[in-house]
């Protein structure tokens, strides 16, 4: 083994001087920072109010603390050994951190963790500038003596930190001329200190890529509340470090003994999740020692272990990536608001001329510790800060401690007063009462607030606690004081307005720490408490979702078959069809017979299903990549995996947001234009859902105003996709194809009949259509419904942008568009059909260069103008009609395994142009489209914007194929398409241009500056209805379909010779 290697800094495994770094230094010597991690003290707060042995009683259980120290310098992360069951650990470890050329900064970070098998607790951190360690008043020193450093918390954890660490530092250079020997002493001799250390250190400082003194000092100096402002500790990286260390716990450590393996903690003993802003809760998974020189591990073994560690981390990220409905034993969630303190004793200041009291409150329960912000110079502070945490079964008998401290810059903090009492003393009188008719399990009837009977709690107003230190406050008056501190986490809400009836207000009589103030002052802590049982929270969660998804005002407390499937699909259920069928079967109702399920029935079925199946891990009912309320991802293997607890804690900050963000109907312009909400909604709508579980929600952005609105999928489209996807065998698949084809043809004939004229008025009323732009503005003058459907517009109703410039291509229709610069990008981002190819799409025209074509997809909704126009100037060279299926062109189907464009009925028009060569204009029919009609013939010289044809009733799509070396799409369309967002276009608007000319520039219009009528018209075009009245958006088309007309299909029809073979799409490509 050669001595020219580098220390391993990739994933925190035991350090070695073996060659493990790919980018080897060209210098002869490598500079290292030697960190002597000696010991720590007082890592968790202790009660010092008693005397003798009582003074050692910890507010957090110090007996279960397993401290480990993690050191991070740029990309290098290393950890010490883990010490078991001690609040005063002695590590006596030495960590070597390489100081590499072109490092980012000189910021050195220490973090202390209470590490258990299944979780970790944050105990504080320390930040130092490496330059300040060795340069004192301009004098350089290469070694420092051991020194005590006080730990602080960062703003993310916002925890009460009391610990300190004893550490020393030294700069050393590894001599590469010597080889390794077998003993540790020989290996230590390779690290030498000479005159080159100072020059090497200066060289390293000058090579830093981010050397700004201000930026480093800003990160290492706590704010006025004693918190580090930025979160610099990456939990996933630390997870990799300590997990790798845990695999090597059998190794010996210089200066210490090997660790004995201990059984992993029970999963019920894990610290439960809390999303309060002053949170110190979490979990780590490792137990290992630091081994700088590990001779037993070869370079090859080290590489393999790092690869395995990365694979484990990757699997860990995938497994714990999303919020789910977890099967856990949880009693409920406790909400406590620290309101205020009064009558605190006036501690004298340093000069003893006045009092000095900057109070704050520390709350400790089990392994969870919370801290409020401190209030300056007051004896009656008002906090209005809320915390929340889960109550696990084994914690039901635990005590909760409240400690009031005086912030002191010189002597850490002074104890002022405290109280410790069983948690059940508080929760017994603050447990939310189940609704009437269900005394054991809660079934709330209010989606955004707690609906209770009487006083809303399980105890009467005449009942009071037996503990004299706890007094119930009646007729509480709310405080009007509100503030938001800059230093707090953005999730922290201070002084929020809340319904006082939801919480039980209590006054706690505190015990003074200083005996001389007893009898003179009687400090009290005012709190508000509420305990929600887990069953009640889960049922409340069901009802919130059900009420927000209900779209029919006449059935406010019930759902039909389609609505319930749509809700489950949107939330990520992978077997919604089977689940809803099971509910109907259990209740003896017909799923397709129009029977409705009440909310109570659905909730009962949900509870039964969850209790029977989720615990066994058979199915996931919900899966959120981000929390829909706080928009935060999960960051570690904590037990915040449970969406119910996370929902309760997030919603407790502001219960009004639940209705806004869990709404499954239309999105208001104000909500949709918020970037974070749009991204979250896209993820909830499209993210990682598989076939049969895709969402019914489509986001569309208006090109002129920029507003983003949600479009609802039609019920008949959903029905068609469901039927098609559930066809398991060849005969059943063909049966469904026949059904869809018959449905489209018969519906087309129906709307061509004179009797269909009566449907025009209801269609106009439903979609709120404005006929001012039409040539015929009187609906009674249309002979049939289809005559009205493909109505013509008045001349000049659609402006052709840059009409005289033949190098500008315009939109062929009023549509929702996505565009792609290559076929490969289209198949990666949008078209997921397994058999989709361009030769198949244009029916085996092998003369075209497939890979060199751009693709534009222009989808027409039923409320759109259904005539299509030429996007270019040219001559119609050929027209080809291809018979096929009638699959829906909805994005839900396009992004499935179904090859919609390659199998649907379509007409291909080849237009020969001067600037773009031959372009392919493909009109694709869809479900409920009776036919495609062209108004121009072969040889016709057509102008840009001139009518080319129209679709009869239904949704439809136009595809454009243009050679990519002769054409570029407009940048705004490409950007939206890459994000999965459709753009609303009008006939004549520019969609792209020749590479030798500039993109057409248009003036954008502010939505707020439009008059009211234009705003409503735009919303109706985008959504297909009136945004203000979402309950009327049931579905007009669905009311016009008589399913009995399409269900009588003879078995012999399934094997009709005229029907294409099941494998026809594959054979056509040969």
Swiss-Prot record:
Catalysed reaction equations from the record: a 1,2-diacyl-sn-glycero-3-phospho-L-serine + H(+) = a 1,2-diacyl-sn-glycero-3-phosphoethanolamine + CO2
Catalytic residue positions: 814 (charge relay system), 869 (charge relay system), 956 (charge relay system), 956 (schiff-base intermediate with substrate)
EC number: 4.1.1.65
Cofactor: pyruvate; Ca(2+)
Localization terms from the record: Golgi apparatus membrane; Endosome membrane
Domain C2: 12-149, 315-439
Membrane topology, from the record: Peripheral membrane protein
PTM entry text: Is synthesized initially as an inactive proenzyme. Formation of the active enzyme involves a self-maturation process in which the active site pyruvoyl group is generated from an internal serine residue via an autocatalytic post-translational modification. Two non-identical subunits are generated from the proenzyme in this reaction, and the pyruvate is formed at the N-terminus of the alpha chain, which is derived from the carboxyl end of the proenzyme.
PROSITE patterns named among the record's database cross-references: C2 (PS50004)
Gene3D superfamilies xref list: C2 domain (2.60.40.150)
Record carries keyword Zinc: no
BP GO terms, sorted: filamentous growth of a population of unicellular organisms in response to biotic stimulus; filamentous growth of a population of unicellular organisms in response to chemical stimulus; filamentous growth of a population of unicellular organisms in response to starvation; phosphatidylcholine biosynthetic process; phosphatidylethanolamine biosynthetic process; phosphatidylserine biosynthetic process; protein autoprocessing
Database matches in Pfam families: C2, PS_Dcarbxylase
Binding site for Ca(2+): 408, 411, 414
Example of a GO cellular component annotation carried by this entry: Golgi membrane
Pathway note: Phospholipid metabolism; phosphatidylethanolamine biosynthesis; phosphatidylethanolamine from CDP-diacylglycerol: step 2/2
Modified residues (Pyruvic acid (Ser)): 956
Biased composition (Low complexity): 440-451
Similarity-based family: Belongs to the phosphatidylserine decarboxylase family. PSD-B subfamily. Eukaryotic type II sub-subfamily.
Domain writeup: The C2 domains have an essential, but non-catalytic function. They may facilitate interaction with PstB2 and are required for lipid transport function.
Job description of the protein: Catalyzes the formation of phosphatidylethanolamine (PtdEtn) from phosphatidylserine (PtdSer). Plays a central role in phospholipid metabolism and in the interorganelle trafficking of phosphatidylserine. Important for virulence.
Oligomeric form and interacting partners: Heterodimer of a large membrane-associated beta subunit and a small pyruvoyl-containing alpha subunit. Interacts with pstB2. This interaction may be a means to structurally tether the donor membrane (ER) harboring PstB2 to acceptor membranes (Golgi/endosomes) harboring PSD2 during PtdSer transport to the site of PtdEtn synthesis.
Protein name listed in UniProt: Phosphatidylserine decarboxylase proenzyme 2
Native organism: Candida albicans (strain SC5314 / ATCC MYA-2876) (Yeast)
